[in-house]
Amino acid sequence: MLLFLWIETSSEYFNFDWVTFLGTGYWFFWSIFILSLARILTAYSSLLLLLGFLLLWERIELYLHLCHKILILLVILLCVILMFIICKFWKERWLVAGLSMQIFAPYVHLVSITVMVILFWPVAFYVACLEREVRMRRYRMTHSEKKRLKQCNVITRLRGLQVPVGLPFLLILLGLYLMPLGIYSPCIQEKENLGPKPTIFGHRGAPMLGPENTMMSFEKAVEHGAHGLETDIHLSYDHVPFLMHDFDLKRTTNIGEVQPESACENPAFFNWDFLSTLNAGKWFVKPELRPFYNMKPLSEADKERARNQSIPTLADLLTLAEKERKFVIFDLHRPPPKHPLRHTFVRQVVSVILASKIEQHLIFWLPAHDRQYVRSVAPGFQHVGRLVSIETLAKNNISIINVDYKKLFPNGLRDYKAANIHINVYTVNEPWLFSLAWCSRINSVTTDNIGLLSQLDHPHFFMTPKFYVFMWLLADIISVLFIVAIFCFHWRRETEKEKLFETSSTRTDTQSGNLHIAMKPPVRVVEGPWTLAALYPALPKSGKEHQGHFNFAAPSKKLLPIKNAVTPLKPGKHEIQPPMPTVVFELTQAPTRQATSEATFQTTLPTLKVDKPTMPSIEVPYP
């Protein structure tokens, strides 16, 4: 929001830099610095948010480094401070946001719908996953009442998660679909209702093409088709009206080189003889002192011409205006206390104007001081008022007003246009703002950027109501189709996962049934000569059997004498080869997951070369 607000107030950048110059004494593009900082912080926060979203999407645990935590806290603190400053001291900046929404709202609507379609992808995925989880839990629900109630509570919670995720999204989307019903934009109208292009007054001439309030600047404005010239007038100590905006000579003259101790004094306390010797153009060609960041580079001829500029008088401007038949409007600054013209400055300026022989209707008289005297001695002047009530303007016989462009919000000064009052707004430097004034049927604007605005032959962002309705319905229909397609895609994919789960569960249940089928044990187990049964045949063979193991029961208390029933082996005539027992295990696992492995153990005794020794095999039957 802060970035958007600062971008839209670009017409105020010069005033902001000028105010900081008055406070610091150093000219710097603080407005551009704040804009760049806001863009960097916005990009950083957006990338961090996007990274966090992607990590959550991949189900990776989030870990925010300490540096990121500090930067996020600084961003939040800076936003809070700037928001406080704007709400406390610059409340009118919110009017700029309102004006920008009047012209950008149709495009914001279309972009917002596109963004909502993109955001619907994770929303649909999450809702579909929750639905699949609910169905899977229902499928696995046991018949036990206690577990059943517990499962039902889990399902209810899962259902409840779908509401806060899907419902706000649908409400916002519905609001966007109905948003055009509440949009008011002056640039949405029929072509035949579009008013003429506003005429342009050069603000201090053409300050982007030449040093402000110099003859070069005014001549550049005339070359670019200015309808009128705007300036600021001070009176020297010896009664000469001259053109100067600031209340000192530090920024726009070389007084720091000529008389540095007087750089911060009011120019009204200097005589014209001294003021006429000051250079008023060298500062303009210095890159670090250029007044506008987006100025075009000057040619070498213009640079040389700017270096030779001096402070002009009001008479010089009137001569140019009379020659080119241009209107003149100016702010007249009252001299400070102890000035000889403190109370008669208006009459002095009027006498200079009348002496110039300029046609009186070319003068737009803006000062409110001593207006009755001006009417009496110069009845041909066109008197300009401020933004006061229509009744007050009619009482003072004023049919022209000069207002700040922010006053166009909210209704574009409809009442004044209905009263047939000529409206001039200042200071309009951006094409979108000029287009808004054009669509609002404003009569004239005052601008610093005459080079750009004079080239516009059609307002930007203009569209007819039929075209906008077509774009509105087309965007809504396309978005609905995309949303339905995305939802069906996720729903179908989760349904396939659910079916796959059910199939695997059914197969598992079938295999689990095999756990109850008894496995036939092997009929015969060959015992080796080292087993107890072979060595002690008198031992009882009955015992409690465990699956997969052979357990021999303990002998009774009364044991029979054990006879050695094994015939001792006698070596043969030939060399006896040592026995090499080989144990072969054939392991057959049950097909079920829970079955205990059953194995058939088969022990084979290798043949011994002896004199016909015999070892009877012992069969151990299963009970």
Curated annotation (Swiss-Prot):
Tagged with keyword Membrane: yes
Cellular location(s): Membrane
EC number assigned by the record: 3.1.-.-
SUPFAM superfamilies noted in UniProt: PLC-like phosphodiesterases
Membrane topology: Multi-pass membrane protein
Gene Ontology process terms (BP): lipid metabolic process
UniProt-listed Pfam families: GDPD
Domain of life according to the entry: Eukaryota
Glycosylation sites: N308, N397
GO MF annotation list: glycerophosphodiester phosphodiesterase activity; metal ion binding
Top class in the EC scheme: hydrolase
Positions with a binding annotation for a divalent metal cation: E230, D232, H245
InterPro entries given in the database record: GP_PDE_dom, PLC-like_Pdiesterase_TIM-brl
Residues that span the membrane, as ranges: 18-38, 40-60, 70-90, 110-130, 163-183, 469-489
Family in the record: Belongs to the glycerophosphoryl diester phosphodiesterase family.
The protein's name in its UniProt record: Glycerophosphodiester phosphodiesterase domain-containing protein 4
Lineage: Eukaryota, Metazoa, Chordata, Craniata, Vertebrata
Encoding gene, per UniProt annotation: GDPD4
